Amino acid sequence: MNPVLLTRRLRLSDFSASNLPDLAKMNADPDVMRYFPQKLNFEESAELLKRIMAHHQQNGYALFTLHLTESDVFVGWCGLMVVPFEAHFTPAVEIGWRLNKIFWGKGLATEAAEAVLRLGFLELGLSEIVSFTVELNQPSIRVMQKIGMQSEPKDAFDHPKLPTNHPLQRHILYRLTKSLWLKQRECSKTP
């Protein structure tokens, strides 16, 4: 499959049916899924894959598979999706990522997310991209901060797809506008 994006260490490609075994294995890992309501079984991962592919068909973008460029090993996914629920910040496009745990702590989520932001702002013409996670998910929050996203306490929200008082209900919202992203790129070039 032809890559959509290449980074220093990663190849980002559109999902296909052939990615289901790798996706299902990752989604069944309790460590990978610890900040989600549940692990996904094979059938649930197949449904997720169908939604990802349908989103791409409808919107022209979705989540991408991540593979190491040197070895073609499946790392996880990263990409953009329209937020599928109503909240104070919707309609919105969300950036997200999920990596197999053997790739945690290596900067790969940040590397992929930076490429996806560039695609979202420069190729797709998005004016703002959001990301959100549960308050306990510090690894994802660190990635959001590393890629320049910002959070306001007033933007915290209870995820509408989780029951009241669910331990993962409270979420932190991060945002990044195209203008701020461009400004950050300009500042990073200054000596």
Regions found by a protein language model. Give the residues of each.
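Conserved GNAT-fold acetyl-CoA-binding loop/helix
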Residues: 31-52, 62-64
